[in-house]
């Protein structure tokens, strides 16, 4: 009986520690480009330029990073199964509402079929039932941005400077106030 209790507690702890961690990361991403992976919770990467991308949003529009040249970009990587991600969608929506006339834009990225995410069609149906309409949700259907930026857990925030440099990476929860502070601090 004691062994079963210890085993149950061990499994419970392991499950809690990995709540929003990616347990299905492709080995290709971990072996091919280790130079782009972030190993710290916060990372200053201002010398690296952010790679341009062209992704379709849930809204059907195509978004390119280069479309926002001259503005700071907050990129939120998240998943529909991540409870922390879901609990902060309201803050993300509020930041996007407030971006009018500011020097930044808010974009979010999901990767259908990667890391346990729903298919693109299932995700679109699910997302349309939510009430967060002020920020674009980009579909990284090939997982290219996940690989490029070494995204291994959710949520993950990338901050791109107005010059296109990758200014900061933050893994895990980030309050709206901390996001705003970071957007003010980067160039």
Regions picked out by a protein language model, each given a short descriptive name:
Residues 1-4:
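Positively charged n-region of N-terminal signal peptides that target proteins for export
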Residues 16-19:
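C-terminal motif of bacterial Sec signal peptides marking the signal peptidase cleavage site
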Residues 21-23:
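Bacterial signal peptide processing site
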Residues 25, 29-65:
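N-terminal "domain-start" segment that seeds a small globular fold
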Residues 77-94:
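Conserved redox-active cysteine motifs that mediate thiol-disulfide chemistry
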Residues 103-118, 134-142:
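Thiol-based oxidoreductase modules, predominantly thioredoxin-like and allied folds used
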Residues 123-160:
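Short, internal strand/loop/helix patches
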Residues 159-187:
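Thiol-/selenol-based redox modules, centered on thioredoxin-like
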């Amino acid at each position: 009986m004691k062994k079963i209790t210890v085993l149950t507690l061990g499994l419970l702890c392991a499950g809690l520690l990995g709540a929003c961690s990616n347990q299905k990361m492709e080995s290709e991403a971990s072996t091919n480009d280790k130079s782009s992976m972030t190993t710290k919770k916060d990372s200053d990467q201002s010398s690296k330029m952010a790679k341009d991308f062209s992704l379709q949003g849930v809204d059907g529009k195509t978004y390119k990073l280069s479309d926002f040249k001259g503005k700071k970009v907050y990129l939120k990587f998240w998943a529909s199964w991540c409870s922390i991600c879901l609990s902060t969608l309201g803050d993300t929506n509020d930041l996007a509402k407030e971006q009018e006339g500011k020097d930044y834009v808010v974009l979010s990225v999901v990767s259908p079929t990667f890391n346990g995410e729903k298919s693109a069609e299932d995700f679109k149906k699910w997302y349309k039932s939510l009430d967060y309409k002020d920020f674009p949700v980009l579909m990284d259907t090939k997982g290219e941005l996940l690989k490029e930026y070494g995204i291994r857990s959710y949520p993950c925030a990338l901050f791109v400077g107005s010059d296109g440099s990758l200014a900061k990476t933050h893994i895990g929860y980030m309050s709206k106030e901390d996001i705003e502070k970071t957007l003010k601090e980067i160039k």
